[in-house]
């Protein structure tokens, strides 16, 4: 099976990922060392590596595939997503230490879905972590912002990663 070039060369470890901020590198390294993450809100322009960072973290934390729920919120964005998929997934015990719900393009979620998700984040914080990626963090309700560690990813100078 052929893979896209971007998938073949996607960074899989912290040392592969090109950070624009050394403090962010150190933060990610500490999460990997501790084998735990808080709820995360990864923001930045399209193509800055938000989803790549999320997937790299899941790989580095050795999260079992059965403990990962990936959702593209630009395709599924309403409250039924939270009620049907996220609640069911997050309310069961993980195979490992915790589950991860990756909501890619979370800024597409409706405000009602976000409000509902807030309760799920609170109720299942011991067994599930949320990683939200978004281009427009102002579209995420304050209640979600307050429950996530914000992580803005700046655009990388192309020469920083083409040299690798």
Region locations from a protein language model:
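P-loop/Walker A NTP-binding region and its immediately flanking N-terminal helices
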Residues: 1-164
């Amino acid at each position: 099976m052929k893979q896209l070039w971007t998938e073949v060369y996607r960074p899989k470890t912290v040392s592969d990922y090109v950070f624009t901020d050394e403090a962010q590198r150190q933060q990610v390294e500490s999460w990997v060392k501790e084998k735990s993450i808080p709820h995360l809100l990864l923001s930045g322009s399209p193509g800055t590596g938000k989803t790549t960072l999320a997937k790299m973290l899941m790989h580095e934390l050795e999260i079992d595939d059965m403990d990962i729920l990936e959702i593209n919120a630009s395709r599924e964005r309403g409250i039924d997503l939270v009620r049907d998929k996220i609640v069911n997934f997050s309310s069961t015990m993980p195979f490992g230490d915790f589950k991860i719900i990756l909501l890619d393009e979370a800024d597409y979620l409706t405000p009602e879905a976000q409000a509902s998700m807030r309760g799920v984040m609170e109720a299942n914080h011991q067994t599930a972590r949320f990683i939200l990626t978004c281009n427009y963090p102002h579209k995420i309700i304050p209640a979600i912002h307050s429950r996530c560690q914000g992580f803005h990813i700046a655009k990388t100078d192309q020469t920083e990663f083409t040299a690798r």
